[in-house]
């Protein structure tokens, strides 16, 4: 396949961002979900969109509105199931709508298995995936603040959590 304009579709595409939690609730629980998104695909197509930028729907404790991912290979139950996700892909494709997943790679949840393993030992293979500093309980390594307020450090030995 050549690297022609076909591979650069995004340069002129209309991309519609969907924050699933508040987009469309399909089951009356007050939380938007994947079936709700599917129910609006015809409307989105009429708007003339080319792609959906889907904010995180991965499993998460929701401390950072889904950006604190605890499992990149599973869907957050409040949004639906993996089968719902597969249906969304299939239905969007039928309508010529692309799906772009918001993939958060610069941090994980403190409930992610890598972090849980990393906390066990400085020798753990996952330990270097995170920022750690030696310290004493109650004394922070520096004055860096979290995006959510307060110190970016939490005693565990000490790890930085700039987000949640």
List the model feature ranges, each with a label.
Residues 2-163:
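Acidic/aromatic-lined carbohydrate-recognition and catalytic surfaces
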């Amino acid at each position: 396949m050549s690297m022609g304009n076909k591979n650069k579709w995004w340069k002129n595409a209309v991309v519609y961002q969907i924050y699933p939690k508040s987009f469309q609730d399909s089951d009356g629980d007050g939380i938007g979900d994947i079936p709700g998104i599917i129910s609006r695909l015809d409307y989105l197509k009429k708007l003339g969109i080319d792609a959906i930028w889907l904010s995180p729907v991965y499993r998460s404790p929701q401390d950072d509105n889904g950006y604190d991912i605890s499992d990149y290979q599973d869907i957050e139950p409040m949004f639906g199931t993996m089968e719902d996700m597969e249906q969304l892909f299939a239905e969007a494709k039928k309508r010529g709508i692309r799906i772009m997943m918001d993939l958060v790679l610069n941090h994980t949840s403190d409930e992610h298995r890598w972090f849980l393993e990393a906390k066990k030992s400085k020798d753990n293979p996952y330990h270097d995936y995170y920022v750690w500093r030696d310290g004493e309980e109650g004394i922070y390594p520096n004055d860096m603040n979290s995006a959510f307020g307060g110190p970016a450090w939490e005693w565990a030995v000490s790890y930085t959590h700039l987000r949640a």
